[in-house]
Design a protein with these regions (language model features):
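C-terminal charged capping/lid subdomain of soluble metabolic enzymes
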Residues: 113-191
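Internal alpha/beta core interface subdomains
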Residues: 1-7
């Protein structure tokens, strides 16, 4: 939703080359709302082997809704960060969704999102056990140089960072990565 919420659907060309629209943004928003409402309930149910309505809602959000939203309105910084993280060997063992989760936090920092929104997403990730720090992604001590490697790859001309509604530089992204990592440590209270 964050990546799509930043795109002006009147001017945006989606992943498949079509104009973005209100439907894509609405589906992305529904995806986000479903994850927030049912994500923790679904995780807990699955840990006990239970198939509950919350699990079914999350499956629908993760497949159908996110797929249609993606086709209709594309991707932005969160997925570009994922792509940049693939440049660090330490992150190779992490799942796509884990890297995108951290990328979402980076995108929120990059956008200077309200504290309440950052806290909501950080809290959600922490409750689900999703990474909120680079250490959790396998990078023991994040350096500025590593952040720049990720940032430069994320800002490649053919990546999705170009879908942000403002010009983004590798330096801005590196600072957002460092800031997101610091916030993650703060909210985990491990620094």
């Amino acid at each position: 939703f964050f990546k799509n919420n930043n795109l002006d659907y009147a001017d945006f060309v989606g992943f498949l080359g079509d104009k973005g629209g209100m439907a894509g943004l609405a589906l992305a928003k529904l995806c986000y709302e479903t994850l927030m409402a049912d994500g923790v309930k679904a995780k807990v149910a699955l840990e006990k082997g239970a198939l509950t309505p919350a699990v079914e809602h999350i499956i629908e959000a993760n497949t159908l809704l996110s797929g249609i939203g993606f086709e209709s309105s594309g991707l932005a910084a969160a997925h570009a960060i994922h792509n940049g993280l693939t440049m660090l060997p330490e992150c190779h063992g992490m799942y796509h969704g884990e890297k995108v989760a951290f990328g979402t936090i980076v995108q929120l920092v990059l956008e200077d999102a309200p504290t309440e929104k950052l806290e909501e997403v950080l809290g959600f990730c922490i409750e689900l056990g999703l990474p909120v720090t680079m250490k959790e992604l396998g990078v023991a001590e994040l350096t500025r140089e590593q952040a720049m490697i990720v940032a430069e790859a994320a800002c490649a001309p053919d990546d999705t960072m170009c879908n942000m509604p403002f010009e983004v530089t590798p330096e801005m992204v590196a600072n957002a990565i460092l800031g997101a990592d610091a916030l993650g440590h703060y909210y985990l209270m491990d620094e």
